[in-house]
Amino acid sequence: AVGVMVFADNVVEYRPPASRSGSLQGVIHTLDKAQPAKGTELKHPMSHFQERIKRRGLVAVISDFYCDTQELLDNIRPLAMQGQDVILFHLLDPAELNPNIKESTLYEDLETGHAIEVSPVFMNKEYHDRIRAHISAIQNTASGMNADHVLINTSEPLDKALHSYLTFREKRG
């Protein structure tokens, strides 16, 4: 059975798990038409999902995880405690992972519209340290709830990243 829930502050679309012919195609269609939102709030969508999930299974959460790690833990851990096999697919753009700026640049937050000017010194040192610390915090959060964390660079084909992860899972047993 396969299903999907697309959410931002609230549930945008929910297709319950089903094993009928065409279910996977419906999930792909839902993901394909999903639009970026002005932020994400985990509490309501995750409680909505937990109320509706009937059987144990694999739950993949796909996000940039620009959220507080405690909020992530508080809202995803109940799924793991229900016996769900949780995977956090952490999507980041190459420019988020390794920014390369030569002069002061104005960056605009696509979710809030807030703009900030940043210097090359900040981006090449402090930002790099902060993003690595955040990725590490998400990894530790996943580990703390016995979930997998998979960092995906959006410049890589998704099928390659998924294949690598599935190969890792198969070897792990």
Model-derived features with residue positions:
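Exposed, interaction-prone extracellular/peripheral surfaces
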Residues: 1-173
